[in-house]
Amino acid sequence: MKNKGYPLRSSMDELSTKNDNEIDLEKGPLPEYNSEDGSTLPPYSEIWKYIKTVSEDSSTGPTETTNPNVERRQEFKDSHPNIYSLLRLLISVLAVIVVFFTAWVCVNPLEKSIFGKVAFFVTIGITCPILLITIFCFFETWTQAVAQCIKVTVIFLAQCVKVTAVFLAKCIKVTAVFLAKCVKVTAVFLAKCIKVTAVFLAKCVKVTAVFLAKCVKVIAVGLYNSKKDLVVTIWLAWVVICFILFGCVKDGRLNLNKALICSTCSISAALFFILLLVCIPIWTLKHMLFGLFQVLGVQSCVVIVTKGLMYLFDKHIDATGYEIEASSLFVIGNFLFFYEMERPGALKRMPKFIGNGIASFLGGLGNAFGGIGNAFGGIGNAIGRIGNAFRGANDNNDIPLGEMDVESEV
């Protein structure tokens, strides 16, 4: 094939020429290379070949950088082989001792069992020699690995500290700006909130005062008109206070005799205060106080009679007896108070009522015995009638047969 006067070019030359034309559009085409005078630079293809040749030559040479520590260790190993071997053995033994004591601490709690002894002997007999041989034979490898790990760790920590310091500085700056804006916005917001809250509280105080005045008026009227509900409420309050007092007695913090006497007095004072607050009419307060004093008198009489009987018969009430007495007085007192408040004057009429009850009971017993006597008289009459019946039957048996036939015909 004829080249028609065109010089032969390689594919690399064409690619470099194409790239040169694409890159140097503003500067124009490069001058032709003249190998004779050498005044102009060679084309890019020859520069690329030269760079490639230099890189290939440099790649064939040694690329590993010599480490001073490795060189010093190699020189020490070559000059003092015995000391180096002894040092390797010492470090290996120290590592095995560390493993041995670690195994001893872990296995010591289980040493009394068979499993603990077997594990300990396996650790001593197999693991430690293998570990000693491995560390001694691969001393240089694992020391280099440890050194490399320490180096990488130190570099990583330094970078982490640097990044953290930069990050914290930026965070502090951003936080300071944010806090400044927050303080400004918060101050404005709090000023508005204080203003709105003051206006709202003023309105609330006004509305609350009016509402409480109406509530007090309604409650006073309602309590004045519903005396029965008030009596039930007072009675429930008395029950609660008595339970508290008897709980203190049960716990040992209060003497029972004092509790029996002081309970009514305390309740009277509390109810007096409550009734003064709700403005109950004076006759209701007077009635309640008389009822409480009457109940207190009944309780005191029961306590005195009980104590007198116990000392008269030379017997003392134990803890269980005190509880029974307290429960009885509690039930009697509440019943009498509630009955007095429901039916005014019931406690005053109680002696007469008790006398009438006793008289009625005795009259009932007399009537019962009279009825029993009448019953026995009726039984006697019935027996007499039965005797008369038997006597009449015997008289009929004495009549002759002829007379019986005549009577039958008639």
Swiss-Prot record:
Disulfide bonds: none
Gene Ontology process terms (BP): meiotic drive
GO cellular component, one term: ascus epiplasm
Regions that span the bilayer: 89-109, 119-139, 149-169, 174-194, 204-224, 229-249, 265-285, 289-309, 319-339, 353-373
Keyword DNA-binding in annotation: no
Keyword Membrane: yes
Composition-biased stretches (Basic and acidic residues): 11-29
Region Disordered: start-end pairs: 1-39
A Pfam family it matches: WTF
Keywords, sorted A to Z: Cytoplasm, Endoplasmic reticulum, Membrane, Toxin, Transmembrane, Transmembrane helix, Vacuole
Function recorded in the entry: Promotes unequal transmission of alleles from the parental zygote to progeny spores by acting as poison/antidote system where the poison and antidote proteins are produced from the same locus; the poison component is trans-acting and targets all spores within an ascus whereas the antidote component is spore-specific, leading to poisoning of all progeny that do not inherit the allele.
Protein family: Belongs to the WTF family.
Subunit organization: Homomer. Forms protein aggregates. The two isoforms can interact with each other and with themselves. High sequence similarity is required for their interaction.
The name this protein goes by in its record: Meiotic driver wtf18
Species of origin: Schizosaccharomyces pombe
